[in-house]
């Protein structure tokens, strides 16, 4: 059985009079893809900040192995599109030259050889997101946190991105924690789905999202229309 690498136990966080998350409990298991979904203002960013150690819980307990190396890909990667820098230069700035064979294979998968001489500003959204993801792997993290990685990507780019995530998990034995608002892509590609709206509404495997299940009803109440999923299966 896969062991948890992060555990939240009855965690609440207050900012002044605001309580973005209240009594939240969940675990992230090693080598799983766990996706956190929820509407805007649900507390997803607060969860990430707590996981990264940027905030401390007001109450409750968070258990994270202090040796755990965490990589983070923010929703908006602050890199000026006017920057006259090539993909290769960008990655060289972030990485030592002694890349492992596994990371070289991932670079091959994102077609780095073809892209390396392109300016960052000329990349498509999907290409740029894959380059940012590759750069986050250079520190060889145990866990990678992806904040809305699929936003503004077309369907083809989303599929390619998930293929890359699957390869990364397999080759590098990395655990993936992803924030998303796209339920249908999540259903196909996650081991665990956590639905958050200030508190945990439901959690389980994508298989638990069946017609009229508690999971499905909770998602529907937050505006996630699960009948599309029923249609496909």
UniProtKB/Swiss-Prot annotation:
GO molecular function list: ABC-type zinc transporter activity; ATP binding; ATP hydrolysis activity
InterPro entries according to UniProt: AAA+_ATPase, ABC_transporter-like_ATP-bd, ABC_transporter-like_CS, Metal_Ion_Import_ABC, P-loop_NTPase
Membrane topology per record: Peripheral membrane protein
EC number: 7.2.2.20
Binding site for ATP: 38-45
Record-linked SUPFAM superfamilies: P-loop containing nucleoside triphosphate hydrolases
Segments crossing the lipid bilayer: none
A GO CC term assigned to this protein in UniProt: plasma membrane
GO biological process: response to zinc ion
Subunit structure: The complex is composed of two ATP-binding proteins (ZnuC), two transmembrane proteins (ZnuB) and a solute-binding protein (ZnuA).
Task performed by this protein: Part of the ABC transporter complex ZnuABC involved in zinc import. Responsible for energy coupling to the transport system.
Family: Belongs to the ABC transporter superfamily. Zinc importer (TC 3.A.1.15.5) family.
Protein name: Zinc import ATP-binding protein ZnuC
Organism whose genome encodes this protein: Rickettsia bellii (strain RML369-C)
């Amino acid at each position: 059985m896969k062991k948890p690498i992060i555990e939240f136990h009855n965690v609440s966080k207050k900012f002044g009079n605001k309580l973005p998350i209240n009594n939240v409990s969940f675990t992230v298991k090693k080598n799983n893809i766990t996706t956190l979904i929820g509407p805007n203002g649900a507390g997803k960013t607060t969860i990430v900040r707590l996981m990264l150690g940027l905030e401390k819980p007001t109450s409750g307990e968070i258990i994270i192995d202090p040796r755990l190396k965490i990589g983070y890909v923010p929703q908006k990667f602050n890199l000026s599109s006017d920057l006259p820098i090539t993909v290769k230069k960008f990655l060289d700035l972030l990485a030592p030259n002694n890349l492992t064979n596994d990371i070289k294979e991932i670079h091959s998968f994102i077609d780095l050889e073809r892209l390396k001489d392109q300016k960052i500003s000329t990349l498509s959204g999907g290409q740029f997101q894959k380059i940012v993801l590759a750069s986050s792997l250079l520190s060889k993290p145990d866990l990678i946190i992806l904040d809305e990685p699929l936003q503004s990507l077309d369907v083809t780019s989303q599929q390619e991105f998930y293929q890359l995530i699957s390869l990364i998990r397999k080759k590098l034995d990395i655990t993936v924690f992803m924030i998303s608002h796209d339920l249908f892509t999540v259903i196909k590609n996650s081991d665990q789905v956590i639905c958050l709206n200030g508190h945990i509404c439901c959690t389980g495997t994508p298989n638990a999202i069946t017609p009229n299940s508690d999971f499905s009803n909770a998602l529907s109440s937050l505006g996630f229309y699960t009948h599309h999923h029923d249609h496909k299966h």
